[in-house]
Amino acid sequence: MRIGSCVERPTEPRHLSTWFGHADLMHFIDRCIEAEGVGFLVVWGVSANKRSWWDNRGAERLGFHPTQDAEACAAEVLARPNPLDTLGQRFQGGSFVGINYTRHDGAAQTPAARAEAPSLP
């Protein structure tokens, strides 16, 4: 199982692709436990998001059919500033990408912080 962003409601633009609603999570776990004769399978724990990045057709073998879609919250999410720094916005890992990131080229900083930082040679 590869779990997406399992939060009550999408709160950032990235969640429009990765959100995993709680009702879909419960259905997914049930299907992962109860499905028979599947063998080895890698599946994404993600709702039926219109903007999803992942091909999750393999989940059909489990009988998993998500019903929730982050798109219902898109207008609200996109009306707010993106809380992720530039690194988090660029990569699939979101806010986790910059944890213990040691490269000092400013890539993990916000544009405002980068403007205040001394430039590197």
Describe the function of each predicted region:
Residues S5-E12, N82-T86:
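Short charge-dense sequence patches
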Residues W53-P121:
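C-terminal amphipathic/interface module of NAD(P)-dependent oxidoreductases
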Residues P13-S17:
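Short, surface-exposed loop/helix-turn segments at secondary-structure junctions
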Residues I3-R9, W19-F40, A48:
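Alpha-helical substrate-binding/gating segment
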